[in-house]
Amino acid sequence: MRRIIFVLLFFTFLGNGAAQEIDSASKIDWETNRFAVELEARVASTESRTAATVHRAQTRLDQEFPEALFNGLLPLPVDSRHVIEDAVREDPDLASRIARLARTAERSVPRPMQNLRGVSRTYSISLFPDLTQLFVNHRVPYRMERVVRWVPTREFTGIVIYAAEPLPLHGSETGSGPPERVQLVPALLPEIYDTGLRPVLEQDMIDPAAIERWGVAHYTDQTSPDAWRDRAGTQPLRIMARRAFGIIPTDVMISPEDADRILASDHNRNLLKNGRIVIIVSADQIDRIR
């Protein structure tokens, strides 16, 4: 994996004449489409543990949150080529725009720790539209390929792609050996291809309003239709992912036959354009602590 799944940031700073220790942990939940940062400030053992001391610690948490949010987001995949850190390097202006997300973050009620030894607080932002709007650069969806020959298909209510098991990574074959097998990694802007590398859904083919509403696809580890009926409806096209694609394996590859069943129908192409896609991934990819 390109990034370590769990990162605990620990640092000490001086404030109001006493040392306070700050712990920061971030978590992304693709089921709820939220990114959360939990900060915890511990009062130094040499400082009196009064309500005023805890209040100062809480104030420090709020001051440190923008930096913790920025650092926590850096490893998050945007697409199969970039994590947010890469995007910031290519466009430094993104750094200030990401930092501004802290202003509108949801904040939990501060939670005093036992014996007033500190305080913790959780902050969260939504992936859609708060974060994705920073990376969507088109206003009108690009036209998708249309299959004009007759294809056995029908109108579906959504598209469900099963990708919970390790998949062959496209392009990883070496000599006569089998390809590397990887878990599909959720991303803000995933793409879909068939196994011949024909584009089925690229970033600029989806309606920006759909991305703002609920993202390109809904990630879940639930196979029960009740868990994703609102997104894919009651009669979805169910597809098995064939391969994963990308430097970061975020993109799904499906069979040419399944791709044809989608691209041969105006109705089914609109399912892609409107983000009526569910991707079933392994449970450890859904709720990730960094």
Regions found by a protein language model. Give the residues of each.
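Domain-level marker for long, solvent-exposed, non-transmembrane regions
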Residues: A18-R290
